[in-house]
Amino acid sequence: MPRTIVAILVLAVVALGASYGFVQSYRALGIAQGEIKRQTARAEALEVRYATLQRHVKEVAARTNTQRQEVDRALDQNRPWADRPVPAAVVDSLCNRPGARCAVRTPTD
């Protein structure tokens, strides 16, 4: 009889331990699933943002290409003017703007 009681107590402790482990695992699973949902939503939002940025880059590239073609046409139509150097004061004025990309001018330019 005492062995039976000890065996029942041991089985009860093992069952409680297993139940506790199951509850903890189930709780961790719920937390992980919530994190997966959050990360999936974040990834989808980033994909939308990336697609929007790609579209804007293509639009800017198209506008840049159009403007480049217009400048090239204007220069071709005004070859005598286009073949002369741009005056230093004009270069300085154009390059002294935010976002302007100009080569460094030496004093002899």
From Swiss-Prot:
One of its GO terms (biological process) is killing of cells of another organism. The keyword Transmembrane helix applies. Keywords: Coiled coil, Cytolysis, Host cell inner membrane, Host cell lysis by virus, Host cell membrane, Host membrane, Membrane, Signal-anchor, Transmembrane, Transmembrane helix, Viral release from host cell. The keyword Coiled coil applies. GO terms for cellular component: host cell plasma membrane; membrane. Its main location: host cell. It comes from the Viruses. Residues 27-63 form a coiled coil. It is a single-pass type II membrane protein. The chain crosses the membrane at residues 1-17. It is found in: Host cell inner membrane. Interacts (via C-terminus) with the spanin outer lipoprotein subunit (via C-terminus). Part of the spanin complex which spans the entire periplasmic space. The spanin complex is composed of spanin inner membrane subunit and spanin outer membrane subunit. Component of the spanin complex that disrupts the host outer membrane and participates in cell lysis during virus exit. The spanin complex conducts the final step in host lysis by disrupting the outer membrane after holin and endolysin action have permeabilized the inner membrane and degraded the host peptidoglycans. Host outer membrane disruption is possibly due to local fusion between the inner and outer membrane performed by the spanin complex. This is Probable spanin, inner membrane subunit.
